[in-house]
Amino acid sequence: MHVNEMRPDEVRALIRKGEITGPTAGMAGGFTQANLVILKKELAFEFLLFCQRNQKPCPILDVTDPGSPVPSITAPDADIRTDFPKYRVYKRGELADEVTDISSLWEDDMVGFLIGCSFTFEQALMNNGIPVRHIEEKRNVPMYQTNIPCVPAGRFQGPMVVSMRPVPEEQAVRAVQVTSRLPAVHGGPVHIGSPEAIGITDIAKPDFGDAVTIKKGEVPVFWACGVTPQAVAMHARPELMITHSPGHMLVTDVRDEQFGVL
């Protein structure tokens, strides 16, 4: 069976066994995927406030109880220590390690935040005949740090990160309509067109993920991205912060359509 047709729990089981270690775009089609941020309880409120003030890049889907690795609302049989294909470990704002299991790092005062992911609306784009280039090219989605500032909260501040998908010019309006229905997974784009206008100097060199082909007659469309907390971590420099590796998400049990507003 192709991973696109698997149930979320089947995908998570393969990830837990180490049989899937790559990006999760297109897996368990129709189910919501989530970004991850893990912090010590003492920083959890500040980060929650940061997300509340920056709902476009950081729409919260679930928050674990302190010390619990179980996202009880979105995937009650999942374990956030093992069920992402790859994690990043930041120490004092520096990327210290990239691992496939964080069980050995888990402590009983940690809180996990699951943040909506734009992979969720890709099925809706494809259902509307809008191509998703990184899936076509079997690459990770390109992501860029911008000059768009987030609203600060305590020690958390920094620039917004965006993901980019090339869209045929005549379908750009439809892409806005389709994704605006799903505000819990970033919603409509934050920018269409000139990358330079939002501080991206070279679209062929993403800060995270992989470059993709932009064809003649296509326009780059940028959506707020849940990798934003990783850029913010580099500014806030918490003692320890664990995140997913960009593109390597948790596949939840929640269907995409449950987040639709129209």
UniProtKB/Swiss-Prot annotation:
Keyword entries, A-Z: Lyase
Pfam families named among the record's database cross-references: D-Glu_cyclase
Entry EC number(s): 4.2.1.-
SUPFAM superfamilies with a match to the protein in the record: PSTPO5379-like (SSF160920)
GO molecular function, one term: lyase activity
Family: Belongs to the D-glutamate cyclase family.
Protein name as annotated: Putative hydro-lyase BLi00500/BL02808
Organism: Bacillus licheniformis (strain ATCC 14580 / DSM 13 / JCM 2505 / CCUG 7422 / NBRC 12200 / NCIMB 9375 / NCTC 10341 / NRRL NRS-1264 / Gibson 46)
